[in-house]
Swiss-Prot record:
Residues 265-368 form the PH domain. SUPFAM superfamilies: BAR/IMD domain-like, GTPase activation domain, GAP, PH domain-like. GO terms for cellular component: actin cytoskeleton; cytoplasm; dendrite; dendritic spine; glutamatergic synapse; terminal bouton. Residues 617-627 have a biased composition (Polar residues). It holds the Pfam family PH. The record marks R409 as: Arginine finger. Residues 380-564 form the Rho-GAP domain. This is Oligophrenin-1. It comes from Mus musculus (Mouse). Keywords: Cell projection, Cytoplasm, Endocytosis, GTPase activation, Neurogenesis, Synapse.
Amino acid sequence: MGHPPLEFSDCYLDSPDFRQRLKYYEEELERTNKFIKDVIKDGSALISAMRNYSSAVQKFSQTLQSFQFDFIGDTLTDDEINIAESFKEFAELLNEVENERMMMVQNASDLLIKPLETFRKEQIGFTKERKKKFEKDGERFYSLLDRHLHLSSKKKESQLLEADLQVDKERHNFFESSLDYVYQIQEVQESKKFNIVEPVLAFLHSLFISNSLTVELTQDFLPYKQQLQLSLQNTRNHFSSTREEMEELKKRMKEAPQTCKLPGQPTIEGYLYTQEKWALGISWAKYYCRYEKETRMLTMIPMEQKPGAKQGPVDLTLKYCVRRKTESIDKRFCFDIETNERPGTITLQAPSEANRRLWMEAMDGKEPIYHTPITKQEEMELNEVGFKFVRKCINFIETKGIKTEGLYRTVGSNIQVQKLLYAFFDPKCPGDVDFHNSDWDIKTITSSLKFYLRNLSEPVMTYKLHKELVSAAKSDNLDYRLGAIHSLVYKLPEKNREMLELLIKHLVNVCEHSKENLMTPSNMGVIFGPTLMRAQEDTVAAMMNIKFQNIVVEILIEHFGKIYLGPPEDSQVPPVPPPRVTARRHKPITISKRLLREKTVFYTSSLDENKDESHHQTPNGTITSNLDPPKLLQHLKPPMQKSGETDPGRKSPSRPVSDCQSEPCLETDVGRLLFRLQDGGTKATPKASNGPVPGSGHTKTSSFHIRRPAPRPMAHHKEGDTDGFSKVRPPGEKQTIIRPPVRPPDPPCRSITPQKPEPKPETGSGNADEIPSSVVASRTRFFETASRKTGSSQGKLPGDES
């Protein structure tokens, strides 16, 4: 919202409205002063951070350069030599980058901090002094006026005349102070627009130039980077193949260390514990044993020397070896041997199961005879015996322990569970088990039921329907979820559906007593989800779906009455579930990945041919001079097809657009930029419709009206090279550092310049008469010229006239 102007005529009246308007200006001045302080503070912090960052990078480069690779072996490959020297190359590159950055940082304070501080102290500070004088003179005038009005008319005429003259003098002084203050505060209000923006513009200009020089160094770094990447990949491939061989060797060593023994060494050796029987009991002694398979000779070296007795190695000839039954001894990893030298059996204990297996393989040991395992596949089928077992378990649970707290969650004894299952599924008399025997408690029955269901050859809800059930549980639509599961239940085989109904009905009864047993449908789903459903493959993805298996069982329990009332009607089609995540139609635009658009190229004023050696074109397209400050970066309009032709699909600009040099350039993302960095080919320099390409000697000042924020150019332009990044500096050549400008560039002239067949130097071409004397003058010229333009010229492009 704009402020009303302060009229000089109001200074004489000094009305309340005038004071109120003046107060608005004072508040705005104070806000501007605070803003400048913040900019100075944050700018100083930024410059300090850049200086600290540069110092940190240089310290980092020193650390890289101080390290020297060591290696295994007596020589290095060419790739390893490249890798060993890489840190030195990195350090040199970082030093070069930071040297250029430090040159920019050294001038940053002069560009940003000092001009702002000068404006704040001199202009705003002077305005505050005017304010103090204005307030002081006003207070003195009104105080004198009050005293003057209280004078009696009976005073002498000379005294009254003298008082009138004094009041007029103070009024005149106050009026002058008011005029000076109003003039000064309005001047600061207008001049702050360029006095604040210009230093920031100059600082950003120097900052971006420094960044663009970093891009040049990146271009020089690319060939080395590619070669180093190739060396790294080759070295990695060598390492991978070597590691595979070493892993195989390590694996063989872990599984069977004797296979890696050297000639002349025993077949197997290691620590074993020997059971020694004495009159007062049994003890275990530690021995280091060696066994030779060819001679069947076992050498035992005692490790625990008894006091007063000297023990030496004992050689025994092996006759027989067998693994000790687990239930026959309270020790683990035991096996028995018989020897010719000692009568009876010698019991040995290995450190681990794997080590015992190695000893038994070396000694040709045998396994003890066991009963048939109870978990054979043919006994864990969903057959008549299985149904009988499930019904007996359910009957016992609902009769004896349905109110037991933690039912199905508390696990029973594994030995008792195995004993019950072995007795019930005994092929000789299957099902002949009395559950009401005191040997079976409620935890044993529930654990046996879960064990049977989990060890079926195929889960109750089958592998075939597993994915469909999980997919239904993943739906956000509750109606679809219930309808789909309802339909899938009736796709189960008849015996599976019968078993599922039997179990779910039982779980419903259990959940009805949840106040006593604390087993809710959710808790039962957690227990019976993995029991009734199981993925055919054991993968991480399958494990992640267990929570959806639990949801399926929970739905079956909560909607048992509806699901098992009957199959769903054929006409009833479950509603289509909505997608869990809406598909994205447009990819988000980010800094590194943008839509391809016409790129804006920046140029400055044209330069004379005889000054080419002192000019440099920066990576953002700006031609700068080492002697003179650069002019304002100016945008170019989109490229014209031909001189005198317009693009039929292009809309007319909302403001006049001056004719300019142009070339088709597209904005690229980071990946495309790297591709262009690696591309060594050059493209033909496009010809403009109104003159030579900038950088070839003569350029033309132009402007481009921006209706939206212009994309920042990513391409890097050098002298005469419009494709960018195709011109590589020689390895030995050092890039000349471009000093930041000493003052910000002048604003462009937005007037329409008629197209001419020959380019004519304008502002910035060396003719000092055409350069505006100040920023204010240039802007005045712009507004005066723009005010004469009519709306009819806005519908044409400059190229349409020719």
